[in-house]
């Protein structure tokens, strides 16, 4: 008979008392302690064995002997988990387990297939470790401000001056000044047939992605999304009732979309396709000929195009960003951009959505967009007030992405350092803040990329995002953000090289 493990005894104790993971977490809070969902899940699944103090907390909650819980009890055999009857005081878990008067509330089944690992279980574990005093280097999210990137002074000054006038709601689409500046910027980018009434500001691009998916997709409608993707696209399409279908981007071709794979996945249920250009997580910038090929696919199959272009002002190495909408005047196109990345103001939450091209064929979709836009009243007005200033005049982001600039030099360093690690291969990113290296899964014996991310976190205190978090099917990639200062990146890449020098997943 297989030897009983800690997780076996933990599950047995929970089953004997009709206690679930959420009950244990609540009971720990009543005792003034903190157990994270990811932390508890790992104990139950057997991925992690807790430290003695955490085991004592679990034993107290479940009213069992901690020695039995940690190491087993030969006298117990297959008997029920032994209670610790020495405690005279009432116990929080007993109240939880005995309560049958209140029904339980589960999350909506609409969330069953929603994935967003950029802030997921590994991040929860990192938060738990931070709560215990560990210092974690966060290479998992493109948030410039914590790494010393500052908002342009002129933008801050402008917001301060306009703040007294930003106390009320704006037009649901956005301030006139903001939409006018966005329209002019869109015209410079070559977007055809752009009108003020078809420009919408949002609390970041994220809100507008969700809004547009809800406006377009009926249950079962298919939408083509790249793999790897920014996972919010897949999550929002799923939440809206749609069916995301992932087309491959080819690592051997600088991560450009595989047009044959894209077209092979189109069915009668396909309504639209998404491109992310410049791409997150790969940093790829699509050339005009690739974009023209995508337009031809959309044209042949009468698809709407959604273009996530939030990183369009962060191109390097002479690469020029071309907006796909500028190549498709006859097709319905929705283009997303904003200031979070280019102006280092992710916390301000200001993005926009521009509808261009053939607007007659999407008139009903536009009615849906207007309805949902009205329902949320408006995006935050103080952030809208600085769009005109931010898009005009000197663009400080250019100083970051040219040779000698901080983003440019840090990108180069991380690319070269990763290229030197045995078992790691990587395509050089041409834009944005991210790099998406590939691991030799045979060399490192990797079958579970989430476990790899946890192992790296526990050993080196480095937080990355696994490739699976970007809807990449194989467990062989991960994403690194190269925003930390150079001295921090040097230390972290040394740690990463040391980790891969000996790592073999068990």
Report residues per predicted region.
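A short, Lys/Arg-rich alpha-helix, primarily the initiator
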Residues: 1-28
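Conserved glycine-rich beta-strand-loop-beta hairpin in the small C-terminal domain of fold type I
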Residues: 388, 404-415, 426-440, 474
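N-terminal small-domain helix-loop-helix segment of the aminotransferase-like
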Residues: 103-204, 211, 378, 390-394, ...
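Short, basic-rich loop-to-helix N-cap that marks the start of a DNA-contacting helix
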Residues: 45-60, 76
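Conserved core segment of the aminotransferase class I/II
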Residues: 329-405, 415-417, 500
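Recognition helix of helix-turn-helix/homeodomain-like DNA-binding domains
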Residues: 30-50
